[in-house]
Amino acid sequence: MKTLLLTLVVVTIVCLDLGYTRRCFNQQSSEPQTNKSCPPGENSCYRKQWRDHRGTIIERGCGCPTVKPGIKLRCCESEDCNN
């Protein structure tokens, strides 16, 4: 019985992948490429793109925010997928 319980605990930990955090790029526009680990529970990355008087602006980070009209948004759910 103890063996069965231990097996179930191990399988649960492996399946849930406890402690896992998503990693996303977070550099802005033409800055050097950097990434960061997202907060626990944040499982997506985003890339926002828009134009203003400075040219094309790109913002990257964790999550999937809501945006105003005229801003292109791409959300994804794999490691470093928002480049």
From Swiss-Prot:
Disulfide bonds join 24-45, 38-62, 64-75, 76-81. Belongs to the three-finger toxin family. Short-chain subfamily. Type I alpha-neurotoxin sub-subfamily. Keywords: Acetylcholine receptor inhibiting toxin, Disulfide bond, Ion channel impairing toxin, Neurotoxin, Postsynaptic neurotoxin, Secreted, Signal, Toxin. It is found in: Secreted. The lineage of its organism: Eukaryota, Metazoa, Chordata, Craniata, Vertebrata. Expressed by the venom gland. It holds the Pfam family Toxin_cobra-type. One of its GO terms (cellular component) is extracellular region. Coiled coil: none annotated. Binds to muscle nicotinic acetylcholine receptor (nAChR) and inhibit acetylcholine from binding to the receptor, thereby impairing neuromuscular transmission. Residues 1-21 form the signal peptide. This is Short neurotoxin OKI-Ed. CDD domains: TFP_snake_toxin. Its main location: secreted. One of its GO terms (molecular function) is acetylcholine receptor inhibitor activity. It comes from the Eukaryota.
